[in-house]
Amino acid sequence: MTEKRSPLPKSKLWEELKLKAELGIHGVAITKQALDFVRPAELAQEQVHNLFEMDFFVHDFELPSGYDLPGGISVPFRWNPNSANIIDLDGNRTIITNKGHEVAEVHFHKRPGFYGLKTSDGQEMGTIGALYRHRALFFAYSNECSYKDRGEDCAFCNINHTKDVYGEKKGIFWKTPRQIGEVAAAAFAENAVDHLTVSGGIIPERRELEYYLDVAEAIQEHTGLQDFNGTAVVAAPLDLRQIDRFREAGYRTTAMNIELWDKGFYETICPGKARTSGGWDHWLHALKYAVGVFGHGAVRSNMVAGIEPKKRTLEGLEHLAASGVVGTFSVWCPNPGSELEGHRSPVPEWYIDLAFQTTAIWKKNGFTFQQVSDCNASNDSLQHDIWRIEDDLLPSLQESRLELA
């Protein structure tokens, strides 16, 4: 993975990392003038609510997907109209201000060309696959989860609420293997991606497990790539032989997100996973089995950090890494429509500390940056950024940024 070096000194990049954490925790507001200037879904890449609503509030207008800070650190756009950080227009520049003072200039991500194309059955490609920063493509085959039917949604998750709010409105439905194959082919043809992820909610009777095999075949057929550098994100299958089938189908990596390391928290916060996917112990066993199939550093498990004590999360990250699993964490956002809506995440410094320790765990256990990038749906996390800064891997701002005159 070759990326251009950032033009800023590391001291400035560490400041940007802290700002990214703050913007991720507290969100950002945007003025009408700035929003009209960047024109999401026309010039700037727009949000695609194919799985979760990550903003503080639902909305019926287009918002941008993300932006770059001056040193090249990318920040997902998380709208909070009450945030003290506000993106405003200053001439032809978009800037973050706080209490009237300029904090940083930002460059919004340019809308990819394939977003404007349609599949052979007439579906807009931008509703099928979402382009993430650093050349990652994300497919959510389903924007709903059957845990809801039994009242066992993960407490931090708003997948079903997001479908109810945005599904019909934005034309986001179940994706067919052919649709995914066609969008993958268009993204690769545009040279926009070099890694893709397939994920989604749990389907009754675990029918999604067979679906992953059909998707892999369709991607290979339409892209012409036998190795398409894909990650299959699944709930741990009860029959572990299914993991072998993912590898045989052509996926390079797999992921099973355990979410929480403390069993007590896990059973309370993730009742569906605890009761119908074999439980915490089976999940861990499945991850270790997957390492035997895919290899060291080719299996990932994510945790939603900030719900359980940091010490427990770190214990999990250490244990997973020692087993060959890339343990990652995401910043917990108490999303609208989730059971934990209205709760508060830890402070930004809490996550910065966890990110530094996570990156150190990765390196100590012999993972490469390529590995921790390939097995993640998005390698745009705080821990990935720390690795980039430490090893001079940050790209320049020329990576598909939006230039407006």
Stretches found by the model and what they are:
Residues M1-N98, Y289, V293, L314-A405:
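Auxiliary Fe-S-binding modules of radical SAM enzymes
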Residues G66-D153, N160-I172, D392-S396, L402-A405:
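N-terminal [4Fe-4S]-dependent radical SAM core
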Residues Y132-H134, E152, K175-Q179, E210-D214, ...:
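Residues forming well-ordered secondary-structure scaffolds
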Residues F138-A140, T197-G201:
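Short glycine-rich or small-residue beta-strand-to-loop segments that form or flank ligand, phosphate
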Residues S146-D149, I172, T176, P204, ...:
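Short, well-structured alpha-helical patches and their helix-loop capping segments
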Residues T162-L196:
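Conserved alpha-helical substructure of the radical SAM core
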Residues G181, A185-A189, S199-S345, W350-D353, ...:
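Conserved AdoMet/S-adenosylmethionine-binding subsite of the radical SAM
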